[in-house]
Amino acid sequence: MVLMIVSGRSGSGKSVALRALEDMGFYCVDNLPVVLLPQLASALAASNISAAVSIDVRNMPESPEIFEQAMDNLPQAFAPQLLFLDADRNTLIRRYSDTRRLHPLSALNLSLESAIDEEDSLLEPLRSRADLVIDTSEMSVHELAEMLRTRMLGKRERELTMVFESFGYKHGIPIDADYVFDVRFLPNPHWDPKLRPMTGLDRPVAAFLDRHTEVHNFIYQTRSYLELWLPMLETNNRSYLTVAVGCTGGKHRSVYIAEQLADYFRSRGKNAQSRHRTLEKSKS
């Protein structure tokens, strides 16, 4: 059974995550004090029910040792996993401005900006221990819920989920990536006026890239590298592997190569998925 501990900065999406986990059959508890985690797990152990518990800055223990002790006292039937949600400072400020809600640390007479910074410092012990950190800055509510469904179904089936994610460097590197590959040196379809409005999902762009030996070599060497270490990653008690592929705009080269890698590993029987950050962002 899984005990999913959901934490993160206020405004990053903990409530959304908890609702998504509840939809997946988890028994969910919001804002449970850390010291009560062993009691909750013991009560649920006989029912064979996976649980999800959210922890925010208000019920953090006074020291990291108390959290570690609570983890050590969990029943052996449970496999604890720590999910930490985060977002950049400006996004959190905007979300609070939109909802007009008070920050949990506002009772300390701190400004919103100071409360966000103080919370970041207080939650660092949990962030550093997290099994998965998700940056929700560019995510909608639905995208976050879908990502959790993808990741958790892989976890509950005890199968490594490989996520090949394209992105544009001008939009920033995904912080949830385990590996980042830069393909900005490869031939760029952007400079062909006919291909510029298309994406790496379109056949003419794929045909353009497929004509170049260096593109084939890059795909071959990248998949060979991943295949070399995949057996160790699969036995390392992890549920997902995120491989980010970046080009300048995240529209052509990175999309094509992410799709090629995902197709290759799917053909080898792996649970491989593709995600295109720039293309998804342009649709929203």
From Swiss-Prot:
GO terms for molecular function: ATP binding; GTP binding; RNA binding. The gene is rapZ. HAMAP family: RapZ_like. InterPro entries: P-loop_NTPase (IPR027417), RapZ-like (IPR005337), RapZ-like_N (IPR053930), RapZ_C (IPR053931). GTP binds at D56, V57, R58, N59. This is RNase adapter protein RapZ. Keywords: ATP-binding, GTP-binding, Nucleotide-binding, RNA-binding. Residues 266-284 are annotated as: RNA-binding. The keyword Zinc-finger does not apply. Homotrimer. Belongs to the RapZ-like family. RapZ subfamily. It comes from the Bacteria. SUPFAM superfamilies: P-loop containing nucleoside triphosphate hydrolases. Modulates the synthesis of GlmS, by affecting the processing and stability of the regulatory small RNA GlmZ. When glucosamine-6-phosphate (GlcN6P) concentrations are high in the cell, RapZ binds GlmZ and targets it to cleavage by RNase E. Consequently, GlmZ is inactivated and unable to activate GlmS synthesis. Under low GlcN6P concentrations, RapZ is sequestered and inactivated by an other regulatory small RNA, GlmY, preventing GlmZ degradation and leading to synthesis of GlmS. ATP binds at G8, R9, S10, G11, S12, G13, K14, S15.
